[in-house]
Amino acid sequence: MATLSRFLKKRSLASNRLFSTQLPHTNIKSEVSQLIGKTPMVYLKKVTEGCGAYIAVKQEMFQPTSSIKDRPALAMINDAEKKGLISPEKTTLIEPTSGNMGISMAFMAAMKGYKMVLTMPSYTSMERRVTMRAFGADLILTDPTKGMGGTVKKAYELLESTPNAFMLQQFSNPANTQVHFDTTGPEIWEETLGNVDIFVMGIGSGGTVTGVGLYLKSKNPNVKIYGLEPTESNILNGGKPGPHHITGNGVGSKPDIVDMDLMEEVLMVSSEDAVNMARELAVKEGLMVGISSGANTVAALRLAQKPENKGKLIVTVHASFGERYLSSVLYQDLRKEAENMQPVSVD
């Protein structure tokens, strides 16, 4: 079986090389990574009733794997390849993740021909696990009580024991920030015609808020940048790490790449408020998004309600699609309801 798998993989790679030299002249993308970026923005209308400011949201659910993490996954792999640190079919990539970055990494590894090993806390959703495995990645779950710290520790253990292994280190990799300076920031500036006044974004690795913030500030120093973290794990506000449901934010330590001086403030949003807002966005705005997107919206609404921000344009991000959270606290009640539904008789 292993021999057959290797044969099919080699045949696929050979076919791809042949295919790439024989493409007809069209506007069709030659590979799926070219679909990354240039996501649309939309104004929120119903959940913003009573606010004095406008809120526009960049919809990263339109990325190939339905999350913003496709951007840094592609950037970090390309950067490492250019530096000669990794090569397809030879390097095993190992990365700790809370979910979306792992999915994006697995997606890129499958496309480029890398073996991918991911470590992840066991409290993350079943959808994340299945999606990573669907892309061919190996997945190791870690003790949920150890949080992301335990996940990172396990990844480093694997890095030391695995031949030809490499870790892209999203929490300290400058390419994670640079891709948002090069793509996400300019896209926001162009779509708002330079009229953005405030940008607010949850802090996980810190790549998005730092990269976008630096770009917007370079275009207009008066743009205000805000971060946010879970109330239950508010280490950037001097608190202690703790369990929460805003997956992807509040990793329990200050990431190396986050620029705290860039931000006016790091707002705090509770898991309960984030979950409730994500649900509300689905039924009121038709936007089915994840929990961190709910948190971003809560923070944007708080800023929009401040008298000093009346008439201003606030931009935030919906980082991922809500279908990835069906088994999580976000939709677990609806899932149980759906599982218990009984068919009606039809005459």
UniProtKB/Swiss-Prot annotation:
Chain positions with N6-(pyridoxal phosphate)lysine modification: 69
Free-text tissue specificity from the UniProt record: Expressed in tubers, buds and leaves.
Catalytic activity line of the entry: O-acetyl-L-serine + hydrogen sulfide = L-cysteine + acetate; hydrogen cyanide + L-cysteine = 3-cyano-L-alanine + hydrogen sulfide + H(+)
Places the protein is found: Mitochondrion
PROSITE patterns: CYS_SYNTHASE (PS00901)
Gene Ontology CC terms, in alphabetical order: cytoplasm; mitochondrion
Highest taxon of the lineage: Eukaryota
Transit peptide feature, positions: 1-19
Disulfide-linked positions: none
GO biological process, any: cysteine biosynthetic process from serine
Induction cue: Slightly down-regulated by ethylene treatment. No effect from wounding.
Impact reported for residue 157 to N/Q: No effect on catalytic activities
Pfam families in the record: PALP
MF-aspect GO terms: cysteine synthase activity; L-3-cyanoalanine synthase activity
UniProt entry keywords in alphabetical sequence: Amino-acid biosynthesis, Cysteine biosynthesis, Lyase, Mitochondrion, Pyridoxal phosphate, Transferase, Transit peptide
Similarity annotation: Belongs to the cysteine synthase/cystathionine beta-synthase family.
Protein name in UniProt: Bifunctional L-3-cyanoalanine synthase/cysteine synthase 2, mitochondrial
Lineage: Eukaryota, Viridiplantae, Streptophyta, Embryophyta, Tracheophyta
